[in-house]
């Protein structure tokens, strides 16, 4: 294999420069995090070597004693973090250290507020990894060699974090990666061994890799000659607890231990909300340690997040994959599963259809849902906090997990017309418990915002009758709710779809009046249909409206208008269906249209009637300028009529 030996100086990706600047100025109170991140990277490199060496033992190069070493040189003002893991090639160094290989980078930068404390917390959630070294270092050098390659394939990367880095080949005798941080005078506190040991024990104590530092012989004098110094330098002591936390009995693990391990595995500053630790023995043996975070991970709304549940086989890290161990609607869960029954050389292809993994996944989902049900029942305030952070993701389970659909639906929370609280806090059980006598269905309305939902004209008759309606303002709500046809034997019905059927709540006198109005205003309905024939499927007298002049209603089995717009924007072909226009026959605007307007004016009034109904649905007008022109014309007409009336009253 040829070696690319030339030296090159390259510019950082633009987002990297911005991120480095933000970190240096925002992580002022959390600088310790740099060591946690570098150790976690080293641990990942060792995990990768362990896994790959199962297929190719030669990668160990005769050295199977895997470890991470942290050392300080006070004279040179350096901290070195070295591992004998998988190492990197030149291309991998350029890819991993010159760019941020994460799709959410731009979104992350957009979320920053300028508030140092808030931004520091967000940066910690994002997981800045290697770049956190520049929070304390004025210069960083990386020496690395990929396992299985010769010493001549070593790579040296160097940068001061100010916009550019150099990349060149060098001789590297040992496999692995060595990161050398040169510290300025202002960061001298980190040149103390005890300070670094404290950070390691706080953040990385439970890493399943020995973290070693030079032994401190407190009962001996300082070495005087070079031989004694060399001997002392070769003596290393392990400073972390290398026993895997999850393998210990729960009775021996303190809450602080669980919290510290969570911060390591999730790269989070905050404590978790809850955790579930289970040892399963029998036909299948495995251990799971699952955490529900207090705050949403940065990649929560990515359907294919980069981080999730880690899979270990007999304490050997195999892979990190959310969906194989946890469904996507629970992608906020962090933690691990360690199985005794999977083969160590298991392939990713085999994992896709592994019955044991399916059983572990099902059991893990059950435990999470059990814990959420318990929280919702016994700790409603904590559950409200959880739902505020993760409810939008949890509700996806209604559409994705048929086996647990009813359980997930029970955990959902909604805003309703009863108190119009924008914070969803009403369960379906709450709704059913206060349904009116004779009410047969659970009613809901979807919209593109909370205000649009609560002000929907479709709610008018329900408010008049005192019937509670669920308000669903999230874009995903309609997709979710179409998969929940009923709950506890009660059908779910949209107030904006199909014909209005209130069952026993329907006022027969009102229904009869609407039928009579349809007959007596037949000419108006036909004329409106003719004026709007390219936009509506029919025009009918409404039994929904009490205050508004008109509303649009789609078919009972059609997508709502908001969902149609979302699907169309996403590039999906939509059927060319048209909504129905329902009119309030008692409204002054509609009555005015029934008084012999000429064709041109009637056409303008009809267009305005349709456009305002479309706007209340969150729709976009095809020709806003034409709409404004028509409205201005109508207002001018009314103003002149009012002026003429005033003049007549004065006798002018």
Swiss-Prot record:
Record-linked CDD domains: HATPase_Hsp90-like (cd16927)
A GO term, aspect molecular function: ATP binding
Domain of life (superkingdom): Bacteria
Chain residue ranges for the region called A: 1-348
Record's GO cellular component terms: cytoplasm
InterPro entries hit by this protein: HATPase_C_sf, Heat_shock_protein_90_CS, HSP90_C, Hsp90_fam, Hsp90_N, Ribosomal_Su5_D2-typ_SF
Segment forming the signal sequence: none
Intracellular or extracellular location(s): Cytoplasm
Key words, A-Z: ATP-binding, Chaperone, Cytoplasm, Nucleotide-binding, Stress response
Region (C): 566-652
Chief localization: cytoplasm
Region (B): 349-565
Subunit structure: Homodimer.
Function summary: Molecular chaperone. Has ATPase activity.
Family as reported in the entry's similarity comment: Belongs to the heat shock protein 90 family.
Protein name according to UniProt: Chaperone protein HtpG
The organism of origin for this protein: Alkalilimnicola ehrlichii (strain ATCC BAA-1101 / DSM 17681 / MLHE-1)
């Amino acid at each position: 294999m040829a070696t690319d030996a030339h030296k090159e100086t390259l510019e950082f990706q633009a987002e990297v420069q911005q991120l480095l600047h933000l970190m240096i100025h925002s992580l002022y109170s959390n600088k310790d995090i740099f060591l946690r991140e570098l150790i976690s990277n080293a641990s990942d490199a060792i995990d990768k070597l362990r896994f790959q060496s199962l297929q190719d033992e030669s990668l160990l190069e005769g050295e199977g004693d895997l470890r991470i070493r942290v050392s300080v040189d006070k004279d040179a003002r350096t901290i070195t973090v070295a591992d004998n893991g998988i190492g990197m090639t030149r291309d991998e160094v350029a890819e991993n250290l010159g760019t941020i290989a994460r799709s959410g980078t731009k979104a992350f930068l957009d979320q920053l507020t300028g508030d140092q404390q808030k931004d520091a917390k967000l940066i910690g959630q994002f997981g800045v990894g290697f770049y956190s070294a520049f929070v304390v270092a004025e210069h960083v050098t990386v020496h690395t060699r990929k396992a299985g390659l010769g010493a001549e394939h070593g790579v040296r990367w160097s940068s001061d974090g100010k916009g550019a880095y150099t990349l060149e080949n060098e001789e590297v005798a040992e496999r692995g990666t060595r990161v050398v941080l040169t510290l300025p005078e202002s960061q001298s506190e980190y040149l103390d061994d005890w300070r670094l040991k404290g950070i390691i024990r706080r953040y990385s104590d439970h890493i399943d890799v020995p973290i070693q530092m030079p032994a401190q012989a407190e009962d001996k004098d300082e070495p005087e000659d070079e031989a004694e110094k060399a001997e002392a330098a070769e003596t290393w002591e392990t400073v972390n607890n290398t026993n895997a936390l999850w393998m210990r009995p729960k009775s021996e693990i303190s809450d602080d231990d669980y919290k510290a391990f969570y911060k390591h595995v999730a790269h989070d500053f905050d404590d978790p909300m809850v955790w579930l630790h289970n040892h399963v023995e029998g036909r299948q043996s495995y251990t799971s340690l699952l955490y529900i975070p207090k705050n949403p991970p940065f990649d929560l709304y990515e359907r294919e997040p980069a981080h999730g549940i880690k899979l270990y086989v007999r304490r050997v890290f195999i892979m990190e994959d959310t969906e194989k161990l946890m469904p996507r609607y629970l992608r906020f869960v962090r933690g691990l599963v360690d199985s005794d029954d999977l083969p160590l050389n298991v392939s990713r292809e085999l994992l896709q259809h592994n019955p044991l993994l399916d059983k572990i996944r099902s059991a893990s989902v059950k435990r999470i849902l059990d814990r959420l049900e318990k929280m919702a029942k016994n700790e409603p305030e904590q559950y409200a906090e959880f739902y505020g952070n993760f409810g939008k993701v949890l509700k996806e389970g209604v559409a994705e997990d048929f086996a647990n659909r009813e359980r997930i639906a029970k955990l959902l929370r909604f805003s309703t017309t009863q108190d119009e609280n924008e914070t969803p806090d009403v369960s379906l059980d709450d709704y059913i418990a206060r349904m009116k006598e004779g009410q047969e269905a659970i009613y809901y309305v979807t919209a593109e915002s909370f205000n649009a939902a609560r002000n929907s004209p479709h709610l008018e008759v329900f408010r008049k009758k005192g019937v509670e309606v669920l308000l669903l303002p999230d874009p995903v709500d309609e997709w979710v709710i179409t998969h929940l046809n009923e709950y506890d034997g009660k059908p779910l019905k949209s107030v904006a779809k199909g014909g209005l059927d209130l069952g026993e709540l329907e006022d027969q006198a009102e229904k009869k009046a609407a039928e009579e109005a349809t007959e007596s205003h037949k000419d108006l309905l036909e004329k409106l249909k003719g004026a709007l024939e390219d936009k509506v499927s029919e025009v009918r007298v409404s039994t929904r409206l009490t205050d508004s002049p008109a509303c649009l209603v789609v078919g009972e089995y059609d997508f709502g208008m908001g969902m149609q717009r979302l699907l169309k924007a996403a590039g999906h072909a939509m059927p060319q269906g048209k909504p129905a226009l329902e009119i309030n026959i008692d409204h002054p605007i509609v009555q005015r249209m029934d008084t012999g307007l000429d064709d041109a004016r009637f056409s303008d009034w009809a267009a305005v009637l349709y456009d305002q109904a479309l706007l209340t649905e969150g729709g976009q007008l095809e020709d806003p300028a034409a709409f404004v022109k028509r409205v201005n014309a109508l207002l001018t007409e009314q103003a002149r009529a009012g002026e003429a009336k005033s003049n007549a009253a004065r006798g002018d």
